[in-house]
């Protein structure tokens, strides 16, 4: 917002420096920080903050808010899909899912996506900008407040490519896991990437403890390049080498996401080739029946084909499961609600 400071994207140390450099006592920073994580979105409602500090904050800063533009609730499994808008009117999607172990949220990291995967609805809406850490936090906080729940797991698998917004995503991870913030542990966070190889190495060096989920979607470069433009820059061999480094460096097993597209990547030969690729990697394959996206012509593999694929992988000691489909009646897959919003004249 113009030249105002995005105060919710600050760590406590950064906020402390910001406050003291402008002539206010150090302890005021912790008071402000506490209010921010009590979902206060107006400086005037920070009751123990003096008037002169409130005036300074209002003239120098803003509090990012994720507002609910649309909300869909599945009648089958209570999955909730949100379209959130931010201070500049841009919108992203998030999905809250209920499991036995608690609530998980799938959040967006960018408005749109540059990656252009042919089976994904998000890329068809173009790319606007990356999200700030505060805007990623806002998706979680607004959902928790709206549903009166506590989110226990986070998946960065919504709109956008997290590793294309590397610095902001890393800062978000530190903020959301902080004892002073939402206090959601790193081991309860999964980051999904289409495979920006240099950033995987960079992420490994940070030893954050998050789970890395790689969108593989093909057993060879020929198929992957047809469906995922990023594959023209980084080969599967390069990608798997980076994943191996991630496992060796962090001790965290990598999960490979594999969208099953009928007649494209779901044959017995595809399964055997994938098994050979992943042999000895100690990884897990998450099979995803591809979502129907208008204009792609792609169809999901049938249940029999999915099971045959799993059996071939299992015979080579490659663990695989079919991802449970939630929110099927509300198009809970990423990008579809935003696309409809744009068609109706929104941002």
What are these regions (language model features)?
Residues 31, 110, 136-139, 306:
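Glutamine-centric residue-chemistry signal
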Residues 98-135:
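Canonical Radical SAM [4Fe-4S] cluster-binding loop centered on the CxxxCxxC motif
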Residues 1-92, 244-253, 258-347:
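Auxiliary Fe-S-binding modules of radical SAM enzymes
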Residues 144-153, 158-316, 320:
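Conserved AdoMet/S-adenosylmethionine-binding subsite of the radical SAM
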Residues 131, 195, 218, 325-329:
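Short beta->alpha linker loops
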Residues 88-97, 101-102:
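P-loop NTP-binding catalytic core
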Residues 80, 92, 103-107, 115, ...:
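Generic beta-strand structural signal
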Residues 123-153:
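Conserved alpha-helical substructure of the radical SAM core
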């Amino acid at each position: 917002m113009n030249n105002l400071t995005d105060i919710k994207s600050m760590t406590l140390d950064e906020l402390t420096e910001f406050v003291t450099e402008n002539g206010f006592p150090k302890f005021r920073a912790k008071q402000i920080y506490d209010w921010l994580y009590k979902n206060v979105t107006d400086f005037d409602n920070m009751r123990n903050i003096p008037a002169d500090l409130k005036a300074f904050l209002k003239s120098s800063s803003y509090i990012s808010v994720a507002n609910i533009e649309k909300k869909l609730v599945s009648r089958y499994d209570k999955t909730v899909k949100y379209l959130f808008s931010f201070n500049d009117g841009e919108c992203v999607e998030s999905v809250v899912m209920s499991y036995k172990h608690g609530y998980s949220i799938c959040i967006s990291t960018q408005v749109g996506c540059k990656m252009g995967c042919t089976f994904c609805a998000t890329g068809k809406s173009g790319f606007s900008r990356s999200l700030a850490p505060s805007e990623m936090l806002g998706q979680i906080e607004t959902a928790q407040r709206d549903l009166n729940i506590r989110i226990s797991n986070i998946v960065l698998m919504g709109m956008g490519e997290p590793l294309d917004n590397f610095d902001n995503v890393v800062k978000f991870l530190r903020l959301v896991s902080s004892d002073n913030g939402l206090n959601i542990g790193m081991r309860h966070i999964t980051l999904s990437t289409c495979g920006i190889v240099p950033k995987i190495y960079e992420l490994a060096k940070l030893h954050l403890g998050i789970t890395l989920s790689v969108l593989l979607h093909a057993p060879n470069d020929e198929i992957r390049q047809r469906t995922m433009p990023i594959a023209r820059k980084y080969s599967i061999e390069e990608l798997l080498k980076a994943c191996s480094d991630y496992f060796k460096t962090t001790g965290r097993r990598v999960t490979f996401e594999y969208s099953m597209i009928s007649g494209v990547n779901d044959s017995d030969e595809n399964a055997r080739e994938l098994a050979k690729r992943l042999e000895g990697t100690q990884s897990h394959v998450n099979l995803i029946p591809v979502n129907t996206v208008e204009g792609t012509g792609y169809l999901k593999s049938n249940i029999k084909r999915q099971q045959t694929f799993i059996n071939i992988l299992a015979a080579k000691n490659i663990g695989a499961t079919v991802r449970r489909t939630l929110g099927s009646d509300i198009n809970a897959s990423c990008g579809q609600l935003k696309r409809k919003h744009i068609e109706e004249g929104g941002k």
